[in-house]
Amino acid sequence: MAPVRKSRSVNKRFTNETSPRKDAGKSKKNKLRKKLSDKLGPQWTRLELERFYDAYRKHGQEWRRVAAAIRNSRSVDMVEALFNMNRAYLSLPEGTASVAGLIAMMTDHYSVMEGSGSEGEGHDASEVPRKQQKRKRAKPQRSDSPEEVDIQQSIGSPDGCLTFLKQARANGTQRHATGKRTPRVPVQTSFMRDDREGSTPPNKRARKQFDANDDVAHFLALALTDASRRGGSPKVSESPNRRTELSDSSPIKSWGKMSRTRKSQSKHCGSSIFEEWMESSRERKLDSDKDTTLLMDMERAGEMEAPRKGKRVYKKRVKVEEAECNDSDDNGEACSATQGLRSKSQRRKAAIEASREKYSPRSPKKRDDKHTSGAFDALQALAELSASMLPANLMESELSAQLKEERTEYDMDEKSSTPEATSTSSHGEKANVEPDDSLLHAISSVENANKRKSKPSRLVSTDCDDVPTGKLQPQTSGSLRKRKPKVLGDEAPAEFSQNKSINKKELPQDENNMKSLVKTKRAGQVPAQSKQMKTVKALEESAITSDKKRPGMDIVASPKQVSDSGPTSLSQKPPNRRKKSLQKSLQEKAKSSETTHKAARSSRSLSEQELLLKDKLATSLSFPFARRRCIFEWFYSAIDHPWFSKMEFVDYLNHVGLGHIPRLTRLEWSVIKSSLGRPRRFSERFLHEEREKLKQYRESVRKHYTELRTGAREGLPTDLARPLAVGNRVIAIHPKTREIHDGKILTVDHNKCNVLFDDLGVELVMDIDCMPLNPLEYMPEGLRRQIDKCLSMKKEAQLSGNTNLGVSVLFPPCGLENVSFSMNPPLNQGDMIAPILHGKVSSNTSSPRQTNHSYITTYNKAKEAEIQRAQALQHALDEKEMEPEMLEIVKGSKTRAQAMVDAAIKAASSVKEGEDVNTMIQEALELVGKNQLLRSSMVKHHEHVNGSIEHHHNPSPSNGSEPVANNDLNSQDGSEKNAQMPSELITSCVATWLMIQMCTERQYPPADVAQLIDAAVTSLQPRCPQNLPIYREIQTCMGRIKTQIMSLVPT
């Protein structure tokens, strides 16, 4: 026997491979080191490394200087290569790195390089025999007999399990996977073919497979031709693609499982396996009954094997049904977990029963023909076995081609069908004559509609589990039928169609409804149809309103009509047409109801509206939670009303003089927040403390009332309400029901009183549960005056047209008369106001005063009021933080300074010609009662400030209430008499000087003195920007004095 020619691919595969190296992962590092070592030049000596290290520490990375310092013909590249090789070590600080470390690293480098060179020589020497060994091993000899295969494998196998392998192959036993990492479970393998395929290259293996398949196909064609000569079978002609359809079915797998031992013994014998198949087929042809029972057993075995391997494909129509159900499950259309499992199990049972019915007689007439065709069943099983031996890719390609042909055929049928309006009767006729075919047509069309959809819907019919399996069996029995009978049925004679219509009319209505319901449930998995069913239900409810717009169409459609129209006709319609009409009808209905409601509301009179409101209020108060809310919100006893009428924040605003202002600026709020501090957290401890305060207040009020009754006290404080007396009408909370009722006081005790309720009798009620029928009569006197004042202020504001003034009735401001605005200094906000307003006035002198004067006045007044409020707030806060003695000093200094400035200004304004101004001012100050030193200092200070103001020609107003724009700033005569005096600034300067003088006369705490200086310096802020440099100098000097004073504070 001539030797087989070698395959070039075997040698190519081994000759193109490179020999593996142990140091393959270090190849890049070795290359990099070789490059750096090449740049290093000859080996560096110890002296050169010491010189390099010293020069590097001295010159850094200036490699020319470093190379010149080594003086041993070392170039710049060599020096730089040495640095790059030891960059990480040389980057360390000088104390950490050293010369000895660098020398050690280079010595190690050179030793490593020498070792790697010697290892490379060893690898090169051992590379050649390894390649030769691989080439020798890759020469398998091809042989057809199993004995020669065993000999060749025994020669080439390196392990020592040869005897065991021979025994296992000879006895036909099954090997087990006994590797180190494999589980100890039996593995289904084929012995000889796997060994041969593992030792042969892939191209030879594929060639062998195709040759074997061609031989099998040729042999099976001959066998089928021989069988067809004996007697033709309609099953073979009806299913030209039978081989592809039944390639994965259960009888094939069971056939291979039953003949596994014979195939394992005769797998390597080329033509013996086909002879055995022919003998077995001829034996089955002799006894038809035995063959029928054998096929039934094969089906049961396949049914048991198919769920284990995870394949649920049985026949063609079963595939269609399961694809439909799996598609719906994959798209998330399962109703619930239990329903999904139940539906899967039912579909599986139905498919198994349908596959059994393939071989069961459909009618009693064909039962004899079924028994006589056992031989053809055996041939059919042989064809299935041949299909199982085909390659998987060919089977998949044939299956995809078949599915494409079916889709195109169905699309042609769909195009040839009539529209929905004219085809409802034909659909019904088809459903009555051939219910199985029509139902299959609906299912397949639903499946195609699902595949054509771009968006998967999550809506699914919950009735899919209710479909009985008996209804599904006729579907699968006709699964091998094509669309041709349906096309021929459409071209039937007119007499046959008339018979169909007559039969349809004779059927009962209930039976038609049941059939349509089954169709609807089976097609309910389609999202489009489920949506249309929901639309129909919605339209049934709104049929009256929809008929107005669409009188010619019958909107209320029954489920029978929807099912007869078919899913394809439903999908052809626009999806939102009915929804749009429904929305329009609902909108029109809402508009009509609104118009009628408005007309009814306009026609009502005022009394009817009041009665309606009363009814609504009574209805809301009928709920216990609403009454409880009203009690908490508005029920206050005579004792608790003054306590809850007070608010600490409002008291604070009244104290600083801002209680009457409806809106505060950002500056004012920032000052208030900074002065109040951090608010408390609403916690249980806070509530406990507040309740304790309320208890103490109640006890003190009761004590006052008891003393008043006994005669120990003649009157009550103005902040306490009048006590309740016998005979007063009250609104009390009943102690049993905790509901409010009207009553009358019979007796009064320390903290309780007897109340006679109108309908419930006499009960003992706490004083905190009794509210006067008219709370204004029992209001404290101080609170009454405040409320009256607030009401009067509100009326004045309404009369003046200022509606923005909001005054609270419960929390009115108090103590406004105690706030003085005469000593409030200006702040920084006014510094830029005066020049802007001055420019506006000068630019608007030529314009009519009727248009601009009122605007400027209003704007100036608002700004001035805002500045004054900020000044008053800051001043009040400063005074609140001061000690009483310091507060007296500030007030006294400002009072005396104001009097002195007024006297000096009056004297300077009354000077006549020829008189000395200084003399007149000194006389005026003597009248005030100050000594000569103070008078001389005051005059000098006054001359200095007055001169600076006159030099800049921008005087400040003498009165804070007068606006800046109203001053005659642009007067033509420049006489000093008409010039306005900066009285406020002068007063602030004199008051500051007096404060400092009074602090030096007595010894005060340094902290209080520093606080007083801060308040004095703050009051000196000028309005004119030209005076800011002088103010900065004063501020600097005062800061030094404050630092010296604070240094005396004990720590």
UniProtKB/Swiss-Prot annotation:
Gene3D superfamilies, per the entry: 1.20.58.1880
- Output compositional bias ranges, type Basic residues: 1-11, 27-36, 131-140
Alphabetized InterPro entries for the sequence? DIRP (IPR033471), Homeodomain-like_sf (IPR009057), LIN-9/ALY1 (IPR010561), Tudor (IPR002999)
Q: Where in the cell is it found?
A: Nucleus
Domain of life the protein comes from: Eukaryota
Q: In which tissues is it expressed?
A: Expressed ubiquitously in vegetative and reproductive tissues.
Matching SMART domains: DIRP, TUDOR
Composition bias, Basic and acidic residues: 120-130, 279-293, 350-372, 403-417, 586-597
> Principal localization?
nucleus
Alphabetical GO CC annotations of the entry are: DRM complex
Mark out the compositionally biased spans (Acidic residues). Answer: 323-332
Q: Which ranges carry the SANT domain?
A: 39-93
Record flagged with keyword Hydrolase: no
* Keywords annotated in UniProt: Nucleus
Q: Where is this region: Disordered?
A: 1-37, 114-158, 170-210, 225-293, 323-375, 397-605, 948-981
**Would the keyword Methyltransferase turn up in this protein's UniProt record?**
no
Q: Which Pfam families match?
A: DIRP
Which GO biological process categories is it annotated with? DNA-templated transcription
Q: Where is the composition biased (Polar residues)?
A: 560-574, 967-981
Q: How does it assemble?
A: Interacts with SNL1 (via PAH3).
PANTHER family noted in UniProt: LIN-9, PROTEIN ALWAYS EARLY 1-RELATED
Q: What is this protein called?
A: Protein ALWAYS EARLY 2
Q: Which organism is it from?
A: Arabidopsis thaliana
Q: Which gene encodes it?
A: ALY2
